[in-house]
Amino acid sequence: MAKISAVERNKKRERLTKRDAGKRAELKALIKDRALEPEDRFQAVLKLAQLPRNGSKTRVHNRCELTGRPHSVYRKFKLGRIMLRDLASQGQIPGMVKSSW
């Protein structure tokens, strides 16, 4: 099990990311718009830099929903490889069967 503080920190980052997503997208669009004056674009860069660092999508780490494990997490199931294997062998994941050929 991962530390509870690490899992909670990641959840906080997810909340901040959802909250700031619109503002970030708006500022990034202004920055990329070549039709604007360079001064206006630079002001958008400064405003983007003032937003909280944890509001960026790249700060969120994929973690296992059951254990909080940060490595080898399957995006489709949001489970780590160990829990995925355990649940699949118990038949608790619909449609997943052990491969045989």
From Swiss-Prot:
GO biological process: translation
Highest taxon, organism lineage: Bacteria
Entry keywords, A to Z: Ribonucleoprotein, Ribosomal protein, RNA-binding, rRNA-binding
Annotated region (Disordered), positions in chain: 1-20
GO MF, any single term: rRNA binding
Cellular component terms per the entry's GO annotation: cytoplasm; small ribosomal subunit
Short name of one Pfam family: Ribosomal_S14
InterPro entries recorded: Ribosomal_uS14 (IPR001209), Ribosomal_uS14_bac/plastid (IPR023036)
Gene3D superfamilies: 1.10.287.1480
Described function: Binds 16S rRNA, required for the assembly of 30S particles and may also be responsible for determining the conformation of the 16S rRNA at the A site.
PANTHER family named among the record's database cross-references: 30S RIBOSOMAL PROTEIN S14 (PTHR19836), SMALL RIBOSOMAL SUBUNIT PROTEIN US14M (PTHR19836:SF19)
Subunit structure: Part of the 30S ribosomal subunit. Contacts proteins S3 and S10.
Name of the molecule in the record: Small ribosomal subunit protein uS14
Originating organism: Rhodospirillum rubrum (strain ATCC 11170 / ATH 1.1.1 / DSM 467 / LMG 4362 / NCIMB 8255 / S1)
Designated gene of the protein: rpsN
